[in-house]
């Protein structure tokens, strides 16, 4: 069933209303978000028909900077977001999971005052299984002088300083979850009018939840502390109700379910591979934006050692971290088991 745009609030209307509340607003942020959303709509369209097009679905021969084989849709999404955002006139520099170095604004285009760090297509290894995937982004205000090309230091800022963060979930419907530091709002794409409509205002994650999300296939490689925590929440001692395990393998999808229903998502480090001693998720464009959303929705986000994610400042573009995020009381319970950082 389609939603009539005159009876509800579109994302465009929402952004303008928020802009009018700030006397100092210039409209730059609103315009930047419009470009990002435009790119997301294009990617959403391709995701929906990916199974029909042989040249969109599946892997390419290239390997990205993370050492991961790029899926064709991954590559496509990266090109769409890069082209749209760097030519928007509101961005000074872009950081992407798919590029080893930062992506500058092309010659001849206006240099703006914002930075964006982005994972163009999170969970892309699940594309051919038709599992929900998504785009994650983080927005900062530049630190370098206005009008000059952006620098890496403009991107490497503490998570608590984010001007906005969000994700687009490409699932049974396409949703945008947006946080500008004043709560969390959810928008659903109405295909009949091509607009994101405010469907989930003032989102709050339940304080507790009965769901835990972790890749239990790595159990034997975890620290004893993480093993003890998982055993505890699965225990039925004393008549307790054990928590239910739900793990999709797509950060956006797992986080989104827990945001709505309550629960906890964990991605600890392990000894399975020496390649990721500090965890596998990227701090700048995965952990930090999700932490920003979680805290604004009343939840918590920490490393496996109990450090607040938003207090961390990345030292490099693709810095990795552990992540424990979700309902406040569930994360607090995890902290009782958290290992000490050596």
Curated annotation (Swiss-Prot):
Its EC number is 3.1.3.11. Pfam families: FBPase, FBPase_C. Its main location: cytoplasm. One of its GO terms (biological process) is fructose metabolic process. Mg(2+) 2 binds at residues 119, 122, 286. Pathway: Carbohydrate biosynthesis; gluconeogenesis. Homotetramer. This is Fructose-1,6-bisphosphatase class 1.
